[in-house]
Amino acid sequence: MDVEGGGGGGGGAPPRGRNSWGWQKGTLLLAYQSFGVVYGDLCISPVYVYKNTFSGKLRLHEEDEEILGVLSLVFWSLTLIPLLKYIILVLGADDNGEGGTFALYSLLCRNSKMGLLNNMRANHGSLSAYNKEEPCKESRNSMLIKAFFEKHYSLRVVLLLFVLMGTSMVIGDGVLTPTMSVLAAVSGLRIKFPELHENYTVLLACVILIGLFALQHYGTRRVGFLFAPILISWLTCIGGIGIYNIIKWNPSVIRALSPYYIYNFFRKAGKDGWSSLGGIVLCLTGAEAMFADLGHFSKLSLRLGFTIVVYPCLVLAYMGEAAYLSKHREDLQSSFYKALPDRVFWPVLFIATLATAVGSQAIISATFSIISQCRALGCFPRIKVVHTSSHVHGQIYIPEVNWVLMSLCLAVTIGFRDTEMIGNAYGLAVILVMCATTCLMFLVITTVWNRWVVWAAAFTVVFGSVELLYLSACLAKVPHGGWLPLLLSLTTLLVMSTWHYGTAMKQQHEVQNKVCLDHFLGLSSGIGLVRVPGVGFVYSSTTNGVPPMFAHFVTNFPAFHRVLIFVSLQTLAVPKVSPEERFLVGRIGSPANRLFRCIVRYGYKEGRWDHFNFENQLLMKVVEFLRHQDGSGGGGGDRMSAAASGEDEAMSVIPATSSSGGSNQHAFDAGTTTSSCEIDATAGGGGRRKVRFDNDGGGGGEEEEEAAEVKELMEEKEAGVSYMIGHTCVFAHESSSAVKKFAVNVVYGFLRRNSRRPAVVLGIPHTSLIEVGMAYRV
C-alpha cells in the first residue's frame, strides 16, 4: 500500500486494442466491480422512497391517480437524470478519465481563463495532457463567454465558490447517505417485531456503520469484489419481487410509464403533490456518485452496468411496490417490507442490510476522490492520501476523512433516529449537487466542446427545469431537517475557501517578494558568501527568481551548498502528467554558479509515491540535462524558455529514461575517469538498472567540461544532501478588515497548524531538513 501515490492506471482498461479479449475482459471486470462501489446508493432507494413521499399530507384514493402519478414521476426522473443526463451525456465530459465537479472545473481552467486554479502557464503549454482534444474551430459564442469571464474577475470568484459549494454538498452526502441507508434497512425489523424499541434499531445501525468505515482501509478494489455479489443479489431480489408484485396485485400499473399521469397527478394533488417531490427526489440519490467515481472505473463499464442491470431492476422494483400499494393503501409507511412475500422476508431483509453498506460505499469513495482533488489543487488542507491499488490510480483511502465521516454519521444516526427528517436533509444535498453539475455542463458544452449555445441551453433547460422543481420542494423542508446539509456544506465551504485564499495569498506574497538573480549574486558577494560541500534542495512554490525565504536565510547565514537546486512541485489542471513530461530542468545563471531549477509537475489525481527515491531522481535529471544541453547545442524541440523570469534561464523537459516507479534505492558511482558517469538503481523486483553517460571518444573541450561538471555533481552528492523549506506564518495586515483578519489569522492559522507539515508531505528526512521561519503580512 503506497502513501501519497499509486501505480499507473487510467480508466483501468488493459493497454490492448479495443477488439482484443483482454480489453473486453478488463471492461467486464470493471463493470462487475462497479456494482460494489458505484450503484449501491441508487439501488437501495426503493426501501425509503415511497415512505418519504407519502410522509406528508399526500394520500392515496380509490382511483389510484396518486400512486400512478408518483410511479410515473419516479420512472421519468430515473430516465432523465441518471440514464440520459449522467450515463449518456455527463460521463462524456470526463477530464482524461476523471469525473466529478472538480474535473469539470479543471476542463474550464485548462481551456480558458475562467478558473482561478492553475491556469495554463507558458512552461506547461506543450504538455500532451493539454492537447489531447482534436483542435476545432472556436465558435463565436464560446469566445464571447470566455471573454466575459476573463473581463470580470468577480465572476471567476463566484464560479470557484459555486464549484466549492457543489463539492461541499457531495462531501455532505458522505455523512447522510450511510445514515439514511442503514437506518432504512434495519427499520424492517420492526415489521416483524413491532414491540422492538427504537433504541435497538439505532444501536444496530451504529454497529453496521462502524463496520463499514472500518473496512475502508482495504481499498476500493477489495471492497468492490466483496460488495459486488451483495448488490447483484439485491438487484436480483428487488427485480424479481417487483415482477411478482406486478403480476399478483396490479399489472395495469404499467400505464404509469405514460407522462400523462404526471400531469394528472399535479392536477389532482396540487400543493400536496408538489410537496411530495421532496420524497420522490430520493430515487435519484447516487446519480452524482456515478460521475464522481469515474476515476475508479471507465465510462464503458459504468454504462454497461447501469443500462443492462441497474436501470431495469430499479424500474421493476418501483413498479412492483406501486402495484402492491394500489391494493394495500394502509401500508404506506412500510410498503417495501410489507410487499415482500413471507417466504423471502428474512433473506431479503438480510441482503438489504448488507446492501445498505454497498449503497454507502459509493458516496464514501466519491468523497475520498473529491477531497483528494481539492487537496491537490490547494483547496483543502494537507492530509494523508493512501493509494490502495497499484493498477488503478484513482482508488484511494484518506484516514482522517474516513474517521470524521464515521463520527458524523454516528452523531446524525443517534440524533435524528428517523429516516423522514434525514430524508429531508438528504434530498436537498442531492439536488443541489445536480444543479451545480448542470450549470458547469453549460460552460463545458459551449467553451470546451465548442457546440452551439442552443445545445447547451437545451441541456440546461431540460435537466435544470426538472432539478429546480425538485429543489423548490426540498427548500420548503429546510426547517424539518433540510438545514443539516446546509450546515455541513457551509462548514466545509468555509474550510476549503479559507485554505485556498490563505494559500493563494502566501504564494502571491512569495512571487511579489522574490529576489532576481543579479541582485542575489550581488548580495552574496557583498556579504562574503561561503559555498560549503554538498547538494542543497530548496523547495518553494516560485518557478523563477530566488524565493524570499532562501534570500532571508542567506542574509542571516551567508553560506549554502556548492550545488543548489531550486525545486518547485506543481499540481496542474490535468488528472495526470506522463513520466516523460514530469521534470522540467534548467540552469540558473552561468555554469560556474552551479545553480539549477527543477519544476516537477503532477496532475491533481496523482501523488508523491517516490519519497525515498526522489532525491536521486532529481539528480539524475540534472545529469541528463547537462548531457542534453551539451548534445543539443542549446536548442531543440523540447526546450522551453522561462521568459517570465527575466534571467538567463532555459528549461528543458527531461524525459524518463525508463520506468522508475519500482525503484526505491539509487547509488551514484562516479567513474574513474572524467569521461563517464554511471547511475545504478536497484529495482524493487531484484534487478539492477544502469543509466550511463559516456563521451564517445570525441575528446572535445565541451565534452570534457560536461563530464567534469557531472563528476563534480556526483562528488557533491557524496558529501551530503540537505533540504530547505520555508516555515511561514501568514498574518493579515494590520489595516485589513475584521473579516480578513478572522479568516487568515484564526481559521487559516488553525488549519495550517493542524494539517500535515510540508516536510512530511514531501517525505523529507528530518535529519537533513532545514526549515526557515518567516512571517508574511498579506
From Swiss-Prot:
UniProt-annotated location(s): Membrane
Cytoplasmic side: 1-28, 94-156, 221-222, 298-303, 365-395, 446-451, 499-778
Biased amino acid composition, Polar residues: 655-677
UniProt topology in membrane: Multi-pass membrane protein
Swiss-Prot/TrEMBL keywords: Glycoprotein, Ion transport, Membrane, Potassium, Potassium transport, Transmembrane, Transmembrane helix, Transport
Side Extracellular, residues: 50-72, 178-199, 244-276, 325-343, 417-424, 473-477
Major localization class: membrane
Any GO molecular function: potassium ion transmembrane transporter activity
Function: High-affinity potassium transporter.
Protein name as it appears in the record: Probable potassium transporter 13
Native source organism of the sequence: Oryza sativa subsp. japonica
